[in-house]
Amino acid sequence: MGKVVGIDLGTTNSVIAVMEGGKPTVIPNAEGFRTTASVVAYTKSGDKLVGQIARRQAVINPENTFYSVKRFIGRKQNEISQEIRQTSYNVKTSGSSIKIACPALNKDFAPEEISAQVLRKLVEDASTYLGETVTQAVITVPAYFNDSQRQATKDAGKIAGLDVLRIINEPTAASLSYGLDKQNNETILVFDLGGGTFDVSVLEVGDGVFEVLSTSGDTHLGGDDFDQQIVEWLIKDFKQNEGIDLGKDRQALQRLTEAAEKAKIELSNLTQTEINLPFITATQDGPKHLEKTVTRGKFEELCSNLIDKCSIPVNNALKDAKLEASSIDEVVLVGGSTRIPAIQQMVKRLIGKDPNQSVNPDEVVAIGAAVQAGVLAGEVKDILLLDVTPLSLGVETLGGVMTKIIPRNTTIPTKKSEVFSTAVDNPPNVEIQVLQGERELTKDNKSLGTFRLDGIMPAPRGVPQIEVTFDIDANGILSVKAKEKATGKEQSITISGASTLPKDDVERMVKEAEENFDTDQKRRKNIDTKNQAESLCYQAEKQVKEFEDKISQDLKIKIEELITELRSSLEKEEYDNIESISQQLQNALMDIGKNAAQTESKDTKAKDDDTVIDTDFSEAK
C-alpha cells in the first residue's frame, strides 16, 4: 500500500499531511507554503490557476476566480440564498442543481469540479514531495455536513483521481492530533470555526480511544460571514457619502472582500486598522477613493450577532453530551477564525477556562486526518475512533411526519431497523422518503432521496409488514433498505442521490479531469520551457558581452543568430523549435568556455616568448 495522505479541504485554505517516521507531517506545496488557498481561477487565455496565484489575481479577474466553493458543495438552490450574495462570480441554479459560471471558458462547473482542482493541486505537490504518486486519501468535512455534502466531497475526491478511503469529521480529526500522545483520560470540547462552517464536538480522549459524545454546528456560519459584515458596512457608508453602490461592481466587491478579510486578521493583533482602497470607482468628476478606520470595538459591534450565534452550538453540544461546562478539561480551538479575540473571550465565558492554544488551528485538522490515514494504512496502531452522526435520520410517515430511526449523536458505523405498515388498503407499492434533520414535520427537514418498494401482496391497511433498515458506514454515508416480510421483496438505495451530481456526471468529470491532466501538464511544461529559454537568451547575451575579446568572430555571430532564432520561436510559441534551438545555444555557450580558454592559453604563451629577463653576470676568474 502506498502513502495515504490526510487532507483538510477548507473553505479558505486547504492543508495536506502524511505520516512520516511515525509522526504526522504537513506537506508544503510547490510554492513552499504549508497552506494552499482553496481558490481556482481561469485566465482569459484559458490557463488554470490554483492556490495563492489564483487568489492574487482575483481583483482583476473576479468573474473567473472561484473561492469559498465549499459553501456550495452538496447543496441545493433553496439552501444557498445567503452565500450566493457574497460572491463576485456568478452562481447559477437550475432546478435543484448548482453551477458556477466561468465566462473565460464559456462553461459551467459543478462545485465538486472546482474542489477537485484544489485536491488535485494538493496531491500533485505531495506526490512530488514524497517521490511517489499519491492515489489514496482521508478527507475531512465539517461535523455538521449532511449526507449530500459528504457524498459530494467524496465525489470531488473521485474527480481528482483519488480513492477516498474515509471521510471524517474535522473536530474529530483535530482531537486525533491533540490527543495522539495523551495517556490520561480527558473530556475535551473542540471549537472549530473555519472560513465557511462552524462545528462544536465534545469528546472523551485518552489512551488511544477517541469517543465523540456529541456534535453540533452551523454550516452557514464562518469567517466569510465576519468579512461580509465589514463589506456591507463599507458599502453602506460609501453609498451614504458618495451616492454610489459599490455592491453592484464585481471588481469593487472583490477588492472590498479582500480588504475586509485583511482588516479582520489585523484586528486579531491590533486595536485598530486602516482600509485604503484608492480608485475604488469613478464618476464624471474623477476617481473616488475609499479610506476608513476600523477599530476592534467597531468590528465586534458589527459581528455581535455572529458571535452570539457561535454560543448556541456550544450549549447544544454540552446538553446532548449530558455535561456541564465545568466537566470540560480542555477547549481546543480549530480554524483561523478562532484567532478573533471576541471569539476566544466568548469561549472562555461559556466554559469557564482559557482555551488550549497548543495546536496550530490552521494545520491541526490535516494532521489528524494524516493520523487516521496512518491507521487505515496500518502505520498507526492502538487507536480507536468512535464518531457520531450529526443529524437524526428517518422516514416520512402518515400525515407528513418524520419518524426518526437513527437519532443524532449515535456512534457510527451503525445499523438500525424499524417495521412499518401501510396506511391504505391493497397498495401495490409503497414510496419511502428518507429524511435528515431534527424537526417533527417532513417539510422542515432535508429530503435525502426517495425509493419505491413494488410487489406488495394485496392486504388491508396495517397488515403488510415493511422493515426499513438504515445503515451508516464509517464515512457517515447512509444506505437504506426496505423489505416486505411476507413476500421477501426487497429494495435498497444508497443515498448517493443526496449528492447534487448524478453518477454519470461524476464519471464524465473524472474522465475530463484525466484528459485535462495531460493538457495541464503540457501547458506547465511549455511555460517552464519558455521561462528557461528566455533566461538562456539573457545568459547568452551576457556571456557574449563578457567574453567578446576572447571568442572568435564566427562563434559570436553563431550565438547571436541562435538568440534571434530563439526569440522568434518564443514569440510564435513554437515549443518544439524552442527546445531544439535552446539545446544548440547551450552547446554554443559551452564553446565560449573552450574558446576563451584557448585564447587565454595563446596569450600566456605569447607573453612567455616575449619576456626578457634582466640579470647581472659576473666575470669568472
Swiss-Prot record:
This is Chaperone protein dnaK. The keyword Chaperone applies. PROSITE patterns: HSP70_1, HSP70_2, HSP70_3. Pfam families: HSP70. CDD domains: ASKHA_NBD_HSP70_DnaK-like. The keyword ATP-binding applies. One of its GO terms (cellular component) is chloroplast. Acts as a chaperone. The gene is dnaK. It is found in: Plastid, Chloroplast. Belongs to the heat shock protein 70 family. Keywords: ATP-binding, Chaperone, Chloroplast, Nucleotide-binding, Plastid. Residues 600-610 have a biased composition (Basic and acidic residues). Residues 611-621 have a biased composition (Acidic residues).
